[in-house]
């Protein structure tokens, strides 16, 4: 029987490669060849970075949910960088921190553009299959996610585009290369539609607001080209958008309830206390449930949400009134405190209204740094910030869970805000871990974590370059009308259109994270939010943090390890470590310390007792430095001979003390003065041409006595 082989054209009749340029580098989208069972897919090639992007949607809406079930997954495959995973099974496990943060960065601009009433599960997957360090896989994934969703039949009000922005030598650079990112004072990611900004995420070295806004505008111009590229593909192969089945409340019933209970809801909402508000709303909902017994719990939750949302927004837009009575630019009552935990190396508590965060700072050695097992070239992370959000912080009665995406994202934001002000490894050779425990939450806990971290770091004696504070700005829009308000609390965040978080110093911005629930922001709104956050940040720095702790403590906590560092020749590393690690283990045991020797010759020594660390440093110096004539050492007697004793002044370095130089008086027998294993002081008197070292205990004793008498006279 003959076998007929189909041609490539017959196998993939819709296959096509679309090409454009992105920030000066080739960008390609291959479609119609792979992943034929997903709603839409594309293989994105940016330089030599390759990301497979897919979108799928369930055919039926999910029942019993009051939200749009969107799931965005960014996957890093280590084969993309030619690496084998370091896990026991040698396969990728759960998403790492970088993958989770990238998933959030893509989710945030995509989500607001889906219909809010849709309840079908939608999953967007971006898989990094090849990594070119000069071409960002995050940006390739974001653009690919936008492309496949726009081409698919899934209802979505896109497309969007995204770029990264750097600031190298004062010049704005789009999608910076690997080397440019290392030199850049700005790591900004912007996502936008053709006419509005939908997402901003940034870390920066104290960049001013004007420069930041200029960078955003520059990014938007490049994004418009990306969107034009996507629109051309959609025009050619886009599928008709489907009609989705809405699952919601009977609006006739809602309007009847609104007319009857609106004043009751307003009275319950008019308070600055979250607990009082929740308690006042409960009997109203009970009355509604009795009057309308056919309503489900989900219906009641939706009614409460809609009523609260309308009240909060109408008060702000029509009356300029906030639920807690504050002015639009007024910050909630603030308090700061340091030194709360006596055994922690540093601690600080920051309170803003009913939001309260306690942050601790722990100092460790270089070996305590976090190992990174992802596609990044950074093998270890020296500064770590963890954010914990226990159930009791919002009054919930349930057991704590492991950190989720939200906790990881908030921790990363606070971490990003503090990194630019940390001292260099050379000036402060410590691993630093801050942990923010949210004690009470009513909005802006991530910004309270930034303030708490500043307090804890300065309390620990970490010589940060400048204090950092964080604050958020909210937004309410209606058509062309809009209003921003400073320091939003939980109910304003929940029912508002934006949470614009900015961290920074007096000099400039160090971190930004912008979340929105609408189709985007204009430049005017962004500029207004920047200015409000700048004024709020300066107020917190000058009026709250500075009076409590104006500068880092001059001394570390007595419980913190004392760290010292030296640089040794790389060819001497083997001598410090010794065969099988014998030498370094002996130093650690004798000096009660930890030692980390790095490939470039940097040696870090940490010990609780400062004198232990100094002894270890001295021992290392004696190993790597040639003995100096006239120098005094403390050595160990290793062998006894009739004519003298051999003394080891450093591992592998031994000299002879002749019997005539063993003591200040005449010595008949070597055994009368020293024994094997004794620790004695010796002075180097001579080193011959063959490198043999001659030592004198007598001269060392005389020199030390003379030094002692000289100090007494002074």
Model segments located where?
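Conserved glycine-bearing catalytic or ligand-binding loops at nucleotide- and phosphate-handling centers
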Residues: 2, 66-75, 141-144, 295-300, ...
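Long, basic N-terminal domains or extensions that often function
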Residues: 2-245
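Extended amphipathic alpha-helical scaffolds
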Residues: 2-58, 242-377, 561-575, 583, ...
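Glycine-rich, flexible beta-strand/loop modules in the N-terminal catalytic cores of phosphate-handling
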Residues: 38-122, 128-130, 135, 201, ...
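Conserved helix-loop functional segments at active or binding sites
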Residues: 108-116, 151, 340, 365, ...
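Flexible, glycine/charged-enriched surface loops at secondary-structure junctions
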Residues: 116-122, 157-159, 226-244, 275-276, ...
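Mobile "lid/hinge" segments at catalytic clefts and subdomain interfaces of large enzymes
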Residues: 153-268, 457-554
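Single-stranded RNA-binding regions, centering on S1/OB-family and related RNA-binding modules
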Residues: 559-564, 568-714
């Amino acid at each position: 029987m003959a076998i007929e082989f189909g041609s490539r054209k017959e196998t993939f009749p819709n296959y096509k490669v679309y090409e454009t340029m992105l920030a000066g580098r080739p960008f390609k989208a291959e479609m119609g060849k792979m992943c034929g069972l997903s709603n839409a897919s594309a293989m994105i090639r940016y330089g030599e970075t390759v990301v497979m992007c897919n979108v799928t949607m369930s055919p039926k809406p999910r029942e019993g949910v009051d939200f749009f079930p969107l799931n965005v997954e960014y996957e890093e495959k280590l084969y993309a960088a030619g690496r084998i995973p370091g896990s026991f099974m040698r396969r990728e496990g759960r998403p790492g921190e970088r993958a989770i943060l990238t998933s959030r960065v893509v989710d945030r601009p995509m989500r607001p553009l889906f219909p809010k009433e849709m309840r079908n599960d939608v999953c967007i997957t971006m898989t990094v299959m090849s990594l070119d360090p000069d071409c960002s896989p995050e940006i390739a994934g974001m653009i690919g996610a936008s492309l496949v969703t726009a081409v698919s039949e899934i209802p979505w009000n896109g497309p969007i585009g995204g770029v990264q922005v750097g600031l190298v030598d004062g010049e704005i650079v789009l999608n910076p290369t690997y080397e440019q990112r290392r030199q850049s004072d700005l790591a900004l990611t912007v996502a936008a539609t053709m006419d509005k900004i939908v997402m901003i995420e940034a870390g920066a070295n104290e960049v001013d607001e004007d420069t930041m806004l200029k960078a955003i505008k520059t990014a938007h111009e490049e994004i418009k080209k990306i969107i034009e590229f996507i629109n051309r593909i959609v025009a050619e192969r886009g599928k008709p958008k489907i009609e989705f089945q809405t699952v919601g409340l009977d609006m006739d019933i809602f309007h009847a309830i609104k007319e009857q209970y609106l004043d009751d809801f307003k009275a319950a909402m008019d308070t600055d206390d979250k607990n009082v508000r929740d308690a006042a709303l409960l009997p109203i909902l009970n009355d509604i449930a009795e009057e309308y017994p056919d309503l489900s719990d989900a219906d009641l939750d939706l009614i409460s949400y809609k009523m609260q949302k309308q009240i909060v927004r109408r008060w702000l837009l029509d009356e300029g009134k906030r639920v807690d009575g504050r002015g639009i630019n007024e910050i909630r009552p603030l308090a700061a405190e340091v030194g709360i935990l006596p055994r922690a190396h540093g601690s600080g508590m920051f309170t803003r209204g009913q939001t309260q965060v306690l942050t601790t700072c722990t100092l460790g050695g270089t070996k305590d740094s976090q190992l990174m097992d992802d596609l990044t070239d950074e093998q270890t992370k020296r500064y770590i910030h963890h954010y914990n959000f226990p159930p009791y912080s919002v009054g919930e009665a349930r057991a704590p869970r492991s950190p989720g995406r939200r906790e990881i994202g908030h921790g990363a934001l606070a971490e990003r805000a503090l990194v630019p002000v940390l001292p260099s490894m050379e000036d402060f050779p410590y691993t630093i871990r801050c942990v923010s425990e949210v004690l009470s939450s009513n909005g802006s806990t991530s910004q309270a974590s930034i303030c708490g971290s500043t307090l804890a770091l300065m309390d620990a004696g970490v010589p940060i370059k400048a204090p950092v504070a964080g604050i958020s700005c909210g937004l309410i829009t209606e058509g062309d009308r809009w209003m921003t308000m400073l320091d939003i609390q939980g109910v304003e965040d929940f029912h508002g259109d934006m949470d614009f978080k900015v961290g920074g110093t007096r000099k400039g911005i160090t971190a930004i994270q912008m979340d929105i629930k609408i189709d985007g922001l204009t430049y005017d709104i962004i500029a207004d939010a920047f200015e409000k956050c700048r004024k709020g940040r300066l107020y917190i720095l000058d009026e709250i943090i500075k009076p409590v702790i104006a500068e880092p403590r001059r001394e570390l906590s007595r419980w913190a390890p004392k760290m010292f560092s030296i640089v040794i020749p790389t060819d001497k590393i083997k001598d410090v470590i010794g065969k099988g690690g014998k030498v370094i283990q002996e130093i650690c045991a004798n000096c009660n310390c930890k030692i980390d020797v790095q490939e470039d010759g940097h040696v870090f020594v940490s010990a609780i007792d400062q004198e232990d660390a100094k002894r270890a440093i001295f021992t290392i110096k004696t190993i790597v430095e040639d003995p100096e004539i006239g120098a005094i050492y403390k050595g160990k007697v290793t062998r006894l001979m009739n004519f003298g004793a051999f003394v080891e002044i450093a591992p592998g370095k031994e000299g002879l003390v002749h019997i005539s130089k063993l003591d200040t008086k005449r010595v008949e027998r070597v055994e009368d003065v020293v024994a094997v294993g004794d620790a004695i002081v010796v002075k180097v008197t001579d080193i011959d041409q063959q490198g043999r070292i001659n030592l004198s205990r007598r001269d060392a004793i005389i020199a030390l006595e003379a030094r002692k008498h000289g100090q007494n006279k002074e």
